[in-house]
Each structure stands twice: as C-alpha cells, then as structure tokens.
Design a protein with these regions (language model features):
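Short, small-residue-biased leader/transition segments that mark boundaries at the very start
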Residues: 2-6
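Structural motif
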Residues: 8-13, 39-41, 62, 81-83
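Active-site core of PLP-dependent enzymes with the aminotransferase class I/II
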Residues: 15-34, 45-52
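Hydrophobic beta-strand scaffold residues
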Residues: 38-39, 177
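Conserved active-site segment immediately N-terminal to the catalytic lysine
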Residues: 54-70
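Active-site C-terminal subdomain of aminotransferase-like
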Residues: 68-173, 177-180
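Conserved PLP-binding catalytic core of the aspartate aminotransferase-like
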Residues: 175-204
Length: 207
C-alpha cells in the first residue's frame, strides 16, 4: 500500500478559486491536530511576496509554473512543481534534482534519491505517473535566472499593486469585491445588474 501518510490529507489553494489568500498557518494547526497532512496549492509568483506554505506550517506545496516566463500557448504545455519537507521527500514521484559540488568544488546538479526510480525499483517507483516537462522547467529556470530574486519580487509587487488599484477603481463605480479578505492579483466582483448585462456593456465598448 501507499502507507499511512497518504490516508489523511487536506488540500488548500491559496490564492483560492476567487483569488483570496487563505490563512495557511491556521489551516496547518487544524490539520496537524487531527493527524492530517496539509497540501497547499500556491501561485509561484505570490511566493515572492508572502510567507511560503512551508513557513506557514504546510507539509507539501504544489502549483503551476506557468507564471514563471511561460506564455499561455492555448493552454499548455506547462510545468508543475512540488515541494515537501525532508521527512516526506522519498514519497515524491518523479526524478529529483539535487545540488552538490563537483570534483573541482564547483556547484553541480545531479539526479538524487535514485533508489526510488524505475531502473532500480520498478514495482515501487513513482516516476511512471509523471510526464517529462524538462523544456518548460528550463524555460522557468531561464526566466528566474534572468529576473533574479529582486526582479521576481518586483514583478509580484506590480501584479499585487495593479490588481488592488483596479479593484479600488471598480469599487468606486459600484462594483465592489465579492470577498473582503486579502488577495493577490485576482478577485471576484459583484455585478449589480448581472454578469450578462456587464458583458454586453463591455462588448459595446470593445472591451
């Protein structure tokens, strides 16, 4: 079997479906008190501004790497990411790249924990459920290398500031946010006349 670690888990998206940021720390406390693991679905861009799921007590973090320099491309292909605590590391599916040093003392990257893999333990391997998204991962690596830590924070800050500016402007003309809690760069609004009427009005103005 997969073991007890897979039997009780809770998934929490933050930002959630409506764009709101959840209280991951509170969710982690509740889950751990009940003996469950907390998995957080995160936007990688938001992680540049806010406390990470790991810092908030989550056990696993997953997400879509599309915001990291990948065009929309009619829906794909994209790359997903998954991170966990050391205690759960061997439960991860797929190949894991680790950082080490080569014979000259320079930084190097290797495939690590290969005892989990198909060529060694085929019947227990997890990589047979994975697809190869190395090209997308390389795109994300190039993007992150180009913008750097400060650049990534600046992009995230621009996303945050402009979304909040837009939300405030909409509220000033009678279209308030539906949710009142904190959000990152997406939000839902109330449409007093209904969404259909709003769409017609936007179309008439070529918006």
């Amino acid at each position: 079997g997969l073991g007890d670690v897979y039997k009780r888990q809770v998934y929490l998206a933050s930002p959630n479906f409506l764009g709101g940021l959840e209280d991951v720390s509170a969710a982690a406390e509740i889950c751990h008190a009940a003996g469950a693991k907390l998995i957080v679905g995160a936007n990688p861009m938001a992680l540049a501004l806010f406390k990470t799921p790991g810092e908030a007590g989550a056990d696993v973090c997953v997400g879509d790497g599309q915001p990291l320099g990948m065009p929309l491309s009619y829906g794909g292909p994209y790359v997903g990411f998954m991170a966990t605590r050391t205690a759960l590391m061997r439960k991860l599916p797929g190949r894991i790249v680790g950082q080490t040093t080569d014979v000259d003392g320079k930084r190097a990257f290797v495939l690590t924990l290969q005892a989990r893999e198909q060529h060694i333990r085929r019947e227990k391997a997890g990589s047979n459920i994975c697809s190869n998204q190395a090209l997308c991962a390389l795109t994300a690596a190039c993007y992150l290398g180009a913008v750097g830590p400060e650049g990534l924070r600046e992009v995230a800050r621009q996303c945050y500031d402009k979304a909040h500016y837009f939300a405030d402007k909409l509220a000033s003309i009678g279209l308030p946010r539906r949710e009142k809690g904190p959000f990152f760069h997406e939000f839902a609004t109330e449409c007093p006349g209904g969404a259909e009427k709003m769409l017609v009005a936007l179309e008439e103005r070529d918006i």
